[in-house]
Structure formats: C-alpha cells, structure tokens
C-alpha cells in the first residue's frame, strides 16, 4: 500500500488546501499504541458540578475536612496472635495504663475473657441517620461482621459499613413496618417479619426468595433453631408457631397465652422455647410435643423481650415494670432482679464473649450495663443516660464483642465501642446528659483555675444574718481584675480587723464562718449587743416576718430624707441588711412586744428614743394616754463601746459619738427633724434617713437607713 500523495506546485511546495484532521487531534498513543479510555459521562458530570460549585458565590470559604472515625479490630487481633506466638504463654496479657500510647496493647475481648469490664462499650463513635426519617426498629450485624443491617418502620433494609459506619445501600423489602429479622447460625439465610404478619426469606445479599402470610396480625419476633432447620415466630394473635424453613410450612402451633405474644427465643443448644406475652406470663415450650413445660408468674406487667444467655443456663425477661428478671432453667426459679431503668425496657442483649455481661435499653433512651459478677448485680455498672433522644428499640453486639449498635425511635443507629486507655468518657453528654456534662466541665475548669472543685457559696460576702463568706478566698469570674483596684482604695475597717477588703457590691469575705442560720421568729438584729456582724456570723438568725406596710401619710411624711450609704454594706460581712429600699425599711428593727407596732418606719411606731437598759439610756416620758414600755430583756452593751459613750442627757447636739435625739410624739411643726443627715446615727421613727443604725448587728436603725455601725466592728 503506497502513501497518499500531497498536491504541490512546480517548486515542490504543498498547495493550500483543507487543514489536516490529524493536526487537531490532541490524543497521541503513549504506550503500546493503545489510546487512553475517555472519562464516562458520570465523571464528566461530577467534574462540571464541582466546578460550578467552586465558582458559585458565597462558597469561597475553606471547608474543614473532618476524618471519619474508624474502629479497626485487626490491630488488636494481630497483637494478640503475636503475643501468643512469641511469648509462648497463652494467658500473658500486657498491662494497660491510662496513657494514650498504651492503645497499642488494647486486645480484643476474646483475649480478655477473665475481665468482663474491658468489654463495656460506652464510648460513642458515630451516629448514622437513615435517609428515610423513620424509627429504626431492628439492628443486626451481618454474619461476616463487616456490615450492619437495620430495618425501619417503612419496610426498608439499610446497610452500613461496619468499620467506618457510612451508608452503603437501602432496599425496600416490606410493605409494612419491619418488627424483627435474624440471620441463621450458618449465615446462609435471613428471615424477617413485619407488622402485617408477613414472613419473608432473603439470601445474604438481601435477595428476596420467598414470602408468605405467617400470622393474622402483627408478627413481633423470630428465632432460629440450633440446627437452622426450623424457626419460631410469635404474634398478636396469641400464638407461637414453629415453621420448617425448607418447606415454608407450619409444623406446630403453640397456644396457651391469653393475649398478644410479644417475644420468643429458641434455646441456643437444646429443644426449648421461651415466650413472653402481654398477659404477664413467661412460658417454656417443648417444640417436639408442643406442650407447656412451665409457666412463670413473677412479672406484674407486659413482657416485652426475653433472651437466652449464650451458655443456655439463664433467661432474661423484661417489660413494662422497668426491671429485668433472671431465671435459672435448672430450677425454674427467679435468680436476680436487675433494677436501674425508669421506663419500660424494650430490648436485652447478652455479650457474645463475656456471658456475665448484659445490656438493656428502655423507652427513655437509656442504655444500662449489668454484670452478674459484680458485688451488686442488681444495679448497673455503667449507665448511658442520654444514649438516644427517644426509646431504644434494638441492641446488637459485634460478633467480636468490641462494638455495640443501638437502634432508636429517633431515626438513628448509634455505634459504641470500648473506652480507650486515657478514659474520661464517663463524663460526656451520653452518660450525664447535656446539663450534667456542662456542669462537670465547669467543675473541671474551676478546679484547674482556682484549685477547688466548685466555687464556694457566698465566697465574696455574707448574706443577711448568716455566716459571711468562706475561709478560702476565691477569685470571681470576670471580676478578678478589680481586686487590685479595690485594694488600692481605703475601704475602712472590716469584720476581720485588717483582712482583705471585699469587692464593690459583693460584700467582704468573713473568716468567722459558723453554723448555718436557723429560721426562728427572733429577729437577727437582736443578737448580742456590740457583736455586730461577727456575732451573727457565729449564730445569727433570720427575721421571720415583715412589718405591715405604712400608710400613705406616713410614707409621704418620711420620704423627705435621703437614704443611707451603701459603702458600709460592702464591708458588712455577715451582717443583716438594713432598709435599702422603701419596701424593706422595717427589716432592721424589732417588733414591739405590745402588738404589731414596729421600731423603725412601721405604722404606729413607738415613741422615739432607744429602749431602756442599754448603756444607761432611758425612755423619755411617755404621753399620758400611752401605756408604759415593758422592761427590756436584753443585756446592755459592753462598757466603753467605741462610738457610743454614755451621755448624761439628751441635750447634746447631734454629731459623731452623740446618742440619738428624742422627740415627743407631737413634735413642733417648725424646722426639720434633727439628726436627719445621712452620715449621722439614725433614730427610731423620726429619722427616716439615718446613715447608721445604733442597735442590732448591721440592721438599719432608722427606717430606710443604711447599715449598722456595730456590724462593721
């Protein structure tokens, strides 16, 4: 075959003509003269979509790539095999310390048969949410343990990866809600039942090969015989039926329950069937004869689930009474009652390796672990209080026992693995709920920052009448920068006599913290005279009642004076608060023994002046129509009390160190009342704005007055 000729002119140059089609072809063979296969349409569409998303506005920010959690058991299995081969001692196990580097010594549960506590799966790994928003009724691991199969209320099977827990596929298999499905022991068959009573056969690849109507009403549970030739089902028609798998034919119908049968399970090695019903009975059946062997009447409510232990000696039942009951089939007696749930228990699962470990889920979303080897087997050893937001319907352990999967009414399937060597998972939101975890985190931060487990109550100042602050001086969040500023200001004497000053508006720390106050009728302002805040801090008492509100005339008459100072309250440690506002101005006084008249600004108050018998002071002469005052039962203040020297008469002008002035009831209208300044000592009744109350441990001496001078000494 000759090469094609190219037209040329007389000089041999090629004539202009159409372009060479090979010149526009960008493809050239690179190896063995075989062209590369072009991308298919799906790849091109994905590339175009990604380019469009990148060019779109508002998506220029960098996306944070989060790696998916993966639980790989191959490392632990290989480590265990290596130890058995190299050490030559089958029971040799390396010690595991609370250090992240010791995770390499984490062996599978089969290598730690003598320690069931290592197989508690309470560490959250992943939450898988089905594309179809429907409750997850059943969860089961596939026989090869590489995937997890879930069934929901819409009749769909969903496959999840068993290592990375990502979604793989979804298949519509039933027309109604899937209530139960289980794999055969050899892993070659799958039988499922739905709410309509339909039973279907599937291959391991989820291919439907047969289906028939098994019960007239909903079918709730399915269980295989030990040799995989038969399986048993139960339903709301009150019957327990035994079926031949190969013939898809009913062999025997067991009747004896008086209501819906909610659960059934075949013994793992023997010809024995257990069933639980809504009639509160647990029955044991002989599958060969169909007779009722025994009936247990321990439960007082509906039986929701029943499961044989892997060794076949125990059977666990649970229901609406929120407890799990263990029975020994060798005696047909109740062995133990496991408590710890607050709502009805919906599912039970035994650990495949550690047969003394039991896990259960209830209608509140709680998952509890019980150990029969525990000193107190009736109480859970681990509780996941907030494992799900709604009821837990199904639980399933990985065949190796290192992962637990739970299905719930909140449309999710959650995966839990064993705790890692550092620990700390017991303080997360799954164990303590959101509020408990936040409180625990706050305590941890508080302990790290201030060296204490929690912020002491009233650490920065005392309340009314009770003890002041704690002995330990603790900085307050957000106010620690004010300490230097407060220390640089002269704040005057404190209750501790030279102790650290308090923060503005928060009181002063009180080192004399005593017994807590008691609520009795004796007012706190009637403590030991002269003790002030210190005396009340060691045993102060709260006033029980409040005086009656003053009349409108009294309020208008006493409203002209300014209120007392607030700086003294900040230094008043544990003293009682005086009348800081107009509606509290009767708390600082005490009740008149003759009735409802109050010392202070209460209506119908006593004549002015201090009570008799204190520091040599006497009452002024009472009006003719006013009954005499009873003698005081309180001891006088100590002699030479600072700030209160005895006075020979009441004619002294007001000022520092002067006793209160007295006025008769019908005082002259001319001129304002004396000692009305906010810095002086308040009187009873007339001086509504006195700065310091003379009597009581920090109480407001005069109506809306400030805080007691005695409370600061």
UniProtKB/Swiss-Prot annotation:
The keyword S-adenosyl-L-methionine does not apply. SMART domains: WD40 (SM00320). Residues 604-613, 620-672 have a biased composition (Pro residues). CDD domains: WD40. InterPro entries: Pfs2-like (IPR045245), WD40/YVTN_repeat-like_dom_sf (IPR015943), WD40_repeat_dom_sf (IPR036322), WD40_rpt (IPR001680). Disulfide bonds: none annotated. Residues 566-593 have a biased composition (Basic and acidic residues). Residues 1-37, 448-474, 490-713 are annotated as: Disordered. GO terms for cellular component: mRNA cleavage and polyadenylation specificity factor complex. Residues 460-470, 679-713 have a biased composition (Gly residues). WD repeats lie at residues 131-170, 173-213, 214-253, 256-295, 298-337, 340-380, 387-426. It is found in: Nucleus. Keywords: Chromosome partition, mRNA processing, Nucleus, Repeat, WD repeat. GO terms for biological process: chromosome segregation; mRNA 3'-end processing. It holds the Pfam family WD40. It comes from the Eukaryota. Residues 534-548 have a biased composition (Low complexity). Required for 3'-end cleavage and polyadenylation of pre-mRNAs. Also involved in chromosome segregation where it has a role in chromosome attachment to the mitotic spindle. This is Polyadenylation factor subunit 2. It comes from Cryptococcus neoformans var. neoformans serotype D (strain B-3501A) (Filobasidiella neoformans).
């Amino acid at each position: 075959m000759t090469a094609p000729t190219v037209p040329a002119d007389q000089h041999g140059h090629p004539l202009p003509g159409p372009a060479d089609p090979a010149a526009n072809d960008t493809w050239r063979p690179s190896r063995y003269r075989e062209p590369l296969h072009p991308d298919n349409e799906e790849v091109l569409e994905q590339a175009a979509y990604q380019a469009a998303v990148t060019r779109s506005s508002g998506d220029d920010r960098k996306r944070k790539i989060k790696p998916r959690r993966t639980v790989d058991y191959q490392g632990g299995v290989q480590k265990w095999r290596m130890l058995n081969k190299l050490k030559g001692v089958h029971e040799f196990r390396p010690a595991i310390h609370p250090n992240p580097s010791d995770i390499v010594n984490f062996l599978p549960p089969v290598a730690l048969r003598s320690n069931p506590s290592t197989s508690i799966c309470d560490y959250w790994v992943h939450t898988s949410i089905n594309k179809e928003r429907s409750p997850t009724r059943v969860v089961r691991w596939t026989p090869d343990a590489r995937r997890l199969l879930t069934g929901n209320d819409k009749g769909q099977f969903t496959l999840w990866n068993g290592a990375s827990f990502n979604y793989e596929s979804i298949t519509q298999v039933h027309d109604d809600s899937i209530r139960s499905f289980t794999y055969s022991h050899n892993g070659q068959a799958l039988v499922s039942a739905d709410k309509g009573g339909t039973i279907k056969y599937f291959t391991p690849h989820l291919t439907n090969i047969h289906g028939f109507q098994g019960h007239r009403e909903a079918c709730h549970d399915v269980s295989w015989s030990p040799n995989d030739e038969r399986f048993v089902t139960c339903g709301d028609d009150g019957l327990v039926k035994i079926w031949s798998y190969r013939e898809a034919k009913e062999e025997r119908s067991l009747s004896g329950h008086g209501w819906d049968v909610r659960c059934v399970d075949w013994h793992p090695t023997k010809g024995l069937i257990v069933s639980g019903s809504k009639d509160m009975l647990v029955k044991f059946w002989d599958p060969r004869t169909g007779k009722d062997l025994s009936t247990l009447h321990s439960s007082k409510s509906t039986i929701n689930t029943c499961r044989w232990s892997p060794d076949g000696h125990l059977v666990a039942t649970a229901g609406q009474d929120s407890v799990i009951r263990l029975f020994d089939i060798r005696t047909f007696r109740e062995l133990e009652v496991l408590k710890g749930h607050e709502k009805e228990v919906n599912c039970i699962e035994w650990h495949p390796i550690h047969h003394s470990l039991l896990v259960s889920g209830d209608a509140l979303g709680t998952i509890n672990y019980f150990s029969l080897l525990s000193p107190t087997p009736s109480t859970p050893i681990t509780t996941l209080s907030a494992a799900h937001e709604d009821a837990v319907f199904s639980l399933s352990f990985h065949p190796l026992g290192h992962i637990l999967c739970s299905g719930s009414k909140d449309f999710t399937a959650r995966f839990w693995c064993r705790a890692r060597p550092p620990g700390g998972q017991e303080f997360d939101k799954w164990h303590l709920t959101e509020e408990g975890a936040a409180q625990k985190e706050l305590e941890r931060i508080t302990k790290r920052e201030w060296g204490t487990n929690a912020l002491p109550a009233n650490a920065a100042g005392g309340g009314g009448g009770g003890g002041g602050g704690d002995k330990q001086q603790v900085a307050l969040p957000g106010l620690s920068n004010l300490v230097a500023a407060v220390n640089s200001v002269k704040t005057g004497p404190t209750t501790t006599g030279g102790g650290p000053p308090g923060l503005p508006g928060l009181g002063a720390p009180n080192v004399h913290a005593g017994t807590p106050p008691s609520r009795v009728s004796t007012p706190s302002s009637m403590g030991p005279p002269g003790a002030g805040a210190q005396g009340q801090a060691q045993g102060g008492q709260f006033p029980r009642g409040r005086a009656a509100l003053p009349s409108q005339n009294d309020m208008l008459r006493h409203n002209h004076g300014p209120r007392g100072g607030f700086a003294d309250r900040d230094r008043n440690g544990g003293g009682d608060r005086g009348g800081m506002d107009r509606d509290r101005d009767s708390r600082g006084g005490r009740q008149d023994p003759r009735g409802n008249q109050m010392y202070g600004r209460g209506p119908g108050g006593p004549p002015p002046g201090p009570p008799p018998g204190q520091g040599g002071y006497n009452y002024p002469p009472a009006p003719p129509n006013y009954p005499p005052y009873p003698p005081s039962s309180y001891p006088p203040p100590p002699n030479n009390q600072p700030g209160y020297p005895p006075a020979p008469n009441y004619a002294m002008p007001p000022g520092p160190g002067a006793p209160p002035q007295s006025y008769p009831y019908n005082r002259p209208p001319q001129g304002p009342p004396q000692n009305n300044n906010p810095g002086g000592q308040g009187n009873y009744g007339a001086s509504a704005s006195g700065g310091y109350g003379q009597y009581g441990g920090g109480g407001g001496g005069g109506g809306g007055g400030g805080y007691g001078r005695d409370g600061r000494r």
